[in-house]
């Protein structure tokens, strides 16, 4: 395998530390998903109105849209509040839903308590080798500026906003 091919398969890893307990961080990441996920990031055909993560193993990850449609983008593979969630990323390189879990990559999120009541959120997007085409493009998209790093910054901003407002 060439160095370029190996890099295309390498997992994307991002982390952020937030001023919240693991319970609060987990809840905001999952149950309050719509409050921080940008409505520009979806695979639906109409403008997005809401993002939803169903909190259970086998639960759907999907978006609702202005035309009444829903667009699935993932399935919960592991649900262990408040420490861990594993999601099948069912988006192919052409940004269409991939129904076959064997062809889907995975996003694992871990919530670890650290000093002063804070939580480190570690995200790993892996399994790109399962995708049938467009591996390098997908990895570049989720690892790039508009990918997981920027999304975790939005998540952290939401956590901080809730903490300032006393909502958390």
Short names for language-model regions:
Residues 1-48:
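Hydrophobic ligand-binding cavity/cleft-lining segments
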Residues 32-73, 165-168:
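Short beta-edge strand/loop motif at the mouth of beta-sheet-based domains
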Residues 118-124:
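Short coil-to-beta-strand
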Residues 127-168:
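A conserved amphipathic terminal alpha-helix motif
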